[in-house]
From Swiss-Prot:
GO terms for biological process: translation. It comes from the Bacteria. GO terms for molecular function: rRNA binding; structural constituent of ribosome. This protein binds to 23S rRNA in the presence of protein L20. This is Large ribosomal subunit protein bL21. Part of the 50S ribosomal subunit. Contacts protein L20. Keywords: Ribonucleoprotein, Ribosomal protein, RNA-binding, rRNA-binding. It comes from Leifsonia xyli subsp. xyli (strain CTCB07). Belongs to the bacterial ribosomal protein bL21 family. GO terms for cellular component: cytoplasm; ribonucleoprotein complex; ribosome. The keyword DNA repair does not apply.
Length: 102
């Protein structure tokens, strides 16, 4: 069983071939191919965390779709002054499928 821990959108994700990961928006758009930086590689009993060895490892993923996350609401309120502020935000996300760990 081969799996890797990759840096995806500012976070670390444990992935195997065939895993679908949702991460922050990637510029390549839909149906593009991207490479993710490996932080750790596990191949059976062999664990690789050395940066020199990991520079040779490539984790390839294909972009499935671009989507937006759930809406969150930010509110500010100051007592006795009538000050109210309301703002919403939806994070832009990309869903990718891991197609290879080499």
């Amino acid at each position: 069983m081969v799996y890797a821990v990759v840096r995806a959108g500012g976070r670390q994700e444990k992935v195997e071939v065939g895993t679908i990961v949702t991460m922050d928006r990637v510029k390549d758009g839909e149906n593009g191919t991207i490479e993710l930086a490996a932080v750790l590689l596990v191949d059976g009993d062999k664990i690789t965390s050395d940066a020199k060895s990991l520079s040779k490892v490539t984790v390839t993923a294909t972009v499935l779709e671009d989507l937006r996350g759930p809406k969150i609401v930010i509110q500010k309120f100051k007592n006795k002054t009538g000050y109210k502020k309301r703002q919403g935000h939806r994070q832009e996300l990309t869903r990718v499928k891991i197609i290879g760990i080499k």
